[in-house]
Amino acid sequence: MSNGDAYNFPVIREYIGYADALYGFKSGFDKVVLSLGLKSGGYWPGNESKGLTNHQSTIFLFDADSGKVKAMVGGNYLTAMRTAASSSVSIKHLAREDAKILGMIGAGHQSAFQLRAAVKQRNFERILGWNRNSEKLSLLEAVAVDLGLPFEEVSLDELGAQADVIISITSSFAPILKATQVKAGTHIACMGTDTKGKQKIEAALVAKATVFTDEIAQAITIGECQHAIADGSMTAERITEIGAVISGKHSGRTSADEITLFNGTGVGLQDLSVASD
């Protein structure tokens, strides 16, 4: 995307007025590999009681020359994998090299994927966890034990004060993590804010951080940056697409005390890429 050879189409993401569900489409086209398609799906908060994951999606791939459908691929597992890969890439390029403590906010289906991907990027020594329903933290604790890492349930204040890297992987329409809770030098991977009104991070914290994203257009309209943009505490010009860091066009983190924030909105091209492989 950073080279201009691939682009995402505008996201559609709306409440359907039934089952408290969010439903929409993410799509795009890569001119280099001729990858064309879309992901259809959303978030059904009542699915857990039915033994289903709250996130449900299906990816459709089309032939770029004819428009014919080439494949229909289940998107639940692929979405969890690519979302974890995206935050993991942000940790690789933006977190301090000496990061030792990882803080996890959220303990749903995708949190286990996030944790397993994150530990591949830094030599973490401890995992801290916070979730609205503390009973669900047993999932993260089991993953941490499997990885040979100690796990501790903490308050948000404790998590922010200790964690060198924080991953936020939960659904919220009100800020959970505040600017006063995060120490200098922290890298925050804020994943899954992809709807107007969604918010996990206080706007003051977004404005305070050096912000990176997968796509600026999505970050300022449906992503975590929408609130700081709306209240005037930051402008879109302060946001850098992480592709520029990966390609070497941007230096990324510039100091040990800098707070970096990756606003991972999830782009259609990522879904098409993993579904095509």
Protein language model features and the residues they cover:
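N-terminal ligand-binding/catalytic initiation module
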Residues: M1-A80, S88, D98, L269-L272
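Conserved beta-strand elements of the Class I
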Residues: L102-G103, T260
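Glycine-rich Rossmann-fold phosphate-binding loop(s) that bind the pyrophosphate
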Residues: A107-G108
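NAD(P)-binding Rossmann-fold cofactor-contacting core
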Residues: K120-L147
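N-terminal Rossmann-fold NAD(P) dinucleotide-binding loop
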Residues: S111-A112
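Rossmann-like adenosine-cofactor binding region
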Residues: L149-S233
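Short helix-loop-beta connector
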Residues: L94-I101, N123, K183-A184
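Adenosine-phosphate binding glycine-rich loop
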Residues: Q199-D277
